[in-house]
UniProtKB/Swiss-Prot annotation:
Keywords: Membrane, Photosynthesis, Photosystem II, Reaction center, Thylakoid, Transmembrane, Transmembrane helix. This is Photosystem II reaction center protein M. It comes from Crocosphaera subtropica (strain ATCC 51142 / BH68). The gene is psbM. The lineage of its organism: Bacteria, Bacillati, Cyanobacteriota, Cyanophyceae, Oscillatoriophycideae. It is found in: Cellular thylakoid membrane. The chain crosses the membrane at residues 7-27. One of its GO terms (cellular component) is photosystem II.
Amino acid sequence: MEVNDLGFIATILFVLVPTVFLLILYIQTREETES
């Protein structure tokens, strides 16, 4: 299965961006409930 660099980067960003976004939301809400 051949994957060009642009498609590979796009796939990584497509997975990474929502994951980071959810992590930030999770950490923020957890800090609010702890304090």
